[in-house]
């Protein structure tokens, strides 16, 4: 009999809480991540009022300097700590895979200056189409079709671009490059990006329609991902008959591996919370694990170095926490964490190598307090012990400390 019949893990994408011990090995625009501090700098520079996370104990997490506007609670309602990443990357896929128990010793590649000519030339030779070189860089998916869609409609060239994550995306107007052709090109791109010089997590077909000034992406997106290289705790749960529910891009991150119920993509953080709450309300969700990613912190505000927007986004999520808790059962466990940092006050536009917060809450808790500093994979080890399945590669359970 599990201690908690249902466990709900929410990843606040990129919400770091201070530079990690190995942050000197990770860089942004040539600047080491050693001074990065996503929550600390937002609190210091923009003011951060998150009363619900504060109540659980966010301000109690050990730091060299306290969060400027997030006080410590004398009687927190939950257990808190910070977690360190051991894997060699600071991207979304690496963070999530480690949270589920894997140690990634060969990180995926990200391309802040665009993909190498070797890759572009191979795609051109396979497809018989030229690639628009000016689009070959990290780009907003809507901006890239606004900027280069008209040219594609005239020339039939491919729009190949990337993001902060290890992905290659190909945007194609459905009237110019038919879907079956786009998918075939993406399948080829997948085949040449399984090893260096471009070891990528996903290839994404991004079809769109419309006229210049009024383009829109269609539902015909297709992801060509890679599955985790070893079984994660998601797989262990699914194999043992424990239901797993994914909300947001979780299913994409794991290529569907170990997911028994995909609740679908989400349009925003608030939509993600809505879907999570709908999941909590499911009458047949009697026992199991839900896994939610809220990406706006990272995609909309972190990479764009928008401190005030990031603050507002955190405060919007915090305001929904009582609603999440109201829909939890007495024997549910809520875990809130992150997958890496993305300090909106820092140099460059990339993720930052940071500790991440961990907040644990249950209506069943009799106690509260600060847990020892741990590692990302401790989350999956705790989930595994709770449901009586094996852990994955790494992780130490803190289940016995949740009382």
UniProtKB/Swiss-Prot annotation:
It is found in: Cytoplasm. Belongs to the phosphopentomutase family. Keywords: Cytoplasm, Isomerase, Manganese, Metal-binding. The lineage of its organism: Bacteria, Bacillati, Bacillota, Bacilli, Lactobacillales. One of its GO terms (biological process) is 2-deoxyribose 1-phosphate catabolic process. PANTHER family: PHOSPHOPENTOMUTASE. The keyword Iron-sulfur does not apply. GO terms for cellular component: cytosol. Mn(2+) 1 binds at residues 13, 339-340. It is an enzyme of class 5 (isomerase). Its EC number is 5.4.2.7. HAMAP family: Phosphopentomut (MF_00740). The gene is deoB. Pathway: Carbohydrate degradation; 2-deoxy-D-ribose 1-phosphate degradation; D-glyceraldehyde 3-phosphate and acetaldehyde from 2-deoxy-alpha-D-ribose 1-phosphate: step 1/2. It catalyses: 2-deoxy-alpha-D-ribose 1-phosphate = 2-deoxy-D-ribose 5-phosphate; alpha-D-ribose 1-phosphate = D-ribose 5-phosphate. This is Phosphopentomutase. Isomerase that catalyzes the conversion of deoxy-ribose 1-phosphate (dRib-1-P) and ribose 1-phosphate (Rib-1-P) to deoxy-ribose 5-phosphate (dRib-5-P) and ribose 5-phosphate (Rib-5-P), respectively. GO terms for molecular function: magnesium ion binding; manganese ion binding; phosphopentomutase activity. Its main location: cytoplasm. Binds 2 manganese ions. Its cofactor is Mn(2+). Mn(2+) 2 binds at residues 298, 303, 351. The keyword Isomerase applies.
